[in-house]
Amino acid sequence: VELTPHQERMIQLKDFRKNCRIALRPFRYDGSLITHFTYKEYDYAKEVEIATIQNENYRLSFNSMAVLNEPISIKIYDKPKKYRDRVLLYESTGVANSEFTTETNEMIVKLKEAKSKKLAENTDISDKERSYQKKIIENIRLKKLFINYIIPYTERGYKIDEDGNESRVLTKGSIILAVGYNNL
């Protein structure tokens, strides 16, 4: 039985997901997510949300072996797209044909720095309020992560069938994310 290109791709993605999960070690596996996308004639972002257990350090393992066309970018924030004051916690560009990990400890440091800077710039609060806000910042945790995959613009391809009918060729890609936490 010959496999369809779609079936072949699904088998391949399963292998990539397994590699992604292995890269989490010694962290405890918590879940994985395959995000499929189609290249369009404009840049756009796909956002996925990950919930975290508050006091744990998480490792995020990415596998972009199924990003077969233009490389994508990854940006991780503390809040969803609709918030203007969200903080960029992690960024990676030129993501394609690679496997890599990042951890939330580094992201929390960035979040604390951004919040401390904002507090320092705020001049119209009392000393009591300022010291209260400093304590909040010291103990800040990430409850959720908002991962944005930025898919770049790609020229549309066209194909012509035997009857001379033209149709668009959809260029697709996938990125895999596995998440694990340090369970000590």
Regions found by a protein language model. Give the residues of each.
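Non-catalytic extracellular/lumenal accessory regions of secreted precursors
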Residues: 1-47, 183-184
